[in-house]
Structure formats: C-alpha cells, structure tokens
Amino acid sequence: FDKCNDPDYIISSISDFILLLNKNSRAACMPIAGSLADATSSQTMSWITGFPSRVKFNGKSFFHDRSICDSQEIIRNRNTDLAIHISTVNHNKVELNDKIKNIFIGHINSTFNIKPDIFIPVGNPGIDHRGIMFRTDNVVSVLLDKIREIELLSTQDVMNMLSEVDNL
C-alpha cells in the first residue's frame, strides 16, 4: 500500500471481489491485525463457528464454554480478586463488586455504585484521540480521528505505561 498510487482502489477491488463470491458462496475479507493476529483469529472464529475465540475443537466438532469468559460468574465464584474495567465511550453508572478490588480506566464523567480502588480517566476515541472502532462482530472497522485537544491520556497510553511498569 505504501508504494501504491491509489490504495483505495485496491480495497475497493477486494470488496467487489468478495461481493461477487457471495453470490454463490460465503466469503469475507478479514484483516491480519493485532500484535499476534489475535483480532484476525477472533474474526475468523466468529465467521466460521459463530462463536468467539474460546472454542475447543474435537475432531469434526467444537465445544464453546460460554461461562468461561462470564465476568459476573467469575466474580461471583471468587475466581478473581481484581477486575479491570475499561469504558471510554459510555459514562453511565458502572456496577462494581465490593468483594474484589476494582480498577476503572475510562470516561472522566463515569459514575459508580461504589468508589473504584483506582480510577484512571482517559479521553474518548474519535473525539480526544485517534483510534479504530470495531462493529460488535469484529468484521467491520472504522478509523476514528481526533477532533479536540484534551489533557487526558488515551487507553492505549495507559496500557503502554502499565506494560512498561511490568518490564522493570
């Protein structure tokens, strides 16, 4: 793409080809994304099985444990002692569990049923910072641009800082 004079034409051609294939079969265009292609893996699993990545394959069938990632059940069964909540867009009241420690990274105007142990306010993607928004099935993405200047860090900045602390 870097050396192409018209990268939009390439994307348009790929999209047209996928539409043509979908007349008689099933096809999708999925990006190779994430540091270890984790976004690609999730999209492919959703496309092929209808389930997210947490699938166990057994011969010609598969098993999906829908409770393995159920945060409410994990907290209720005391399988964790810490929850990290990330919510940069929605500032509605967040229900935190008082039986565990809670770290909240998110919208500066967020409200809570109880005070989080740590609250890190961050900017909104597409308003305060550039970013990418994925449709809930992870198949479609939209590039978000920054439209205002604000002193808040992005969620990515916070995560990068936390990963650097871990490497000390």
Task: Name every feature range the model reports, one short phrase each.
Residues 38-39:
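Small-residue-rich helix-loop
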Residues 42-43, 53:
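Low-complexity, serine/threonine/proline-enriched polar segments
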Residues 1-27, 34, 48-168:
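Non-catalytic alpha/beta scaffold blocks inside enzyme catalytic domains
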